Amino acid sequence: KLIRYFLSITLPNTKVFRLSSLLVKLSKPFKFLMPSKIKDMIELMPTKFPKKSLPIKEVYKSSTKKRIARVALLTGCVQKEISPQINEATIRLLNRHGVEVVVPKKIRCCGSLNHHLGKEEDAHQDFKNNINTWYEEHQKGNLDAILSNTSGCGTTMKDYGFIFREDKELSKKAKVISELTKDISEYIFESLKLDIKDKGKKYKVAYHSACSMQHGQKVHSQPVSLLEKTNNEIMEIPEGHICCGSAGTYNILQSKIAKQLLKKKVNNIESLNPDFISTGNIGCITQIAHGTKVPILHTIEVLDLSLIHISEPTRRLV
C-alpha cells in the first residue's frame, strides 16, 4: 500500500517526480539496506533529466503558409520530464506538415496511472478535468483530433466515453473526446503525407508493438507502415504479442515477473541484431532500455529524424 501511495502522488505530478528523483539519487548508496521492491523502484527512477529544446507554449503554430488542421496534444506527466524530445519531435513534425498544435495548461495527466492503481477518485478528477478542458477547446476552435504519443495514455483517453457513459453531465462530452483521440502514428498514417527523402544509409530497426497499442487500441499496422517509409529495414520482434514487463506500474509492483518478461523480450530483440529499437510507449522505452544496450527511439523520433538530417541513434538516458 505504501508503494502504491508513493507512485500515485509521484508519477502524475512532475514537481514531486523531480524531487523524488533527487532523493532516489541520494539514497542509491544505501539501497542494499532496502527491501527488494524498493530497490527495484530505485533502479527504475531516473537521476538526471534531458534539457528541453522547445519553449513551453499553449499553441505551436503551423510552419506552413496554410494551416490544414488543428490538434490538441497530451504531453504527459512522466514522459515530458524524462524524454521531452518525444513531444518536441511530435510538435516539429506536425507543424512542418501544416498542423497547429494546442497544449492546454490545465491538462496534466491522462489519469491512467491512478486508474490502474485503484485510486479512482484521483483518476476521475483527472478524467473530468481533461474532458472539460479539451471539450472547451474543441468548442472554441474546433479540434480535428486529440493526440497521444504514449499508447498507455491513449488507451485510457479512448475509454473516457465508456467510463462516463452513464454520467448525465459528462457522457456527451466524454464520448466526443474519446472519438477525437488518436495515437500519433494513427493520425499521421490517416491524415498526413510525409515527404521522406532517401538518406542513403539504411538501419535495421526492431519494432516493439506496445500492449496498450496492439491490444488496447488495435493499432499495429499504421506505425509499421510509417516506419517502412523511412527506407530502413523494419523487423517485427519474435513473440511480439508478449509484454515487455512494463505495463504501467507492473514492473514495480510485480518486479519479479516483470524482469522475466523483460529478459524474454530483450533476448527476442537481440536475436535480430538490430541497429536500434522503435516503439510508441514511454513505459516500454524505459523498461527495455534497462535490459539492453541497443539504442531505443520512439516511433515519432524515427520519423522526425527521417525528415531532417538523420544521425546515429544514441542510447536513451532513462
What residue ranges belong to the model's regions?
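Iron-sulfur cluster-binding electron-transfer modules in prokaryotic oxidoreductases
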Residues: 1-311, 315
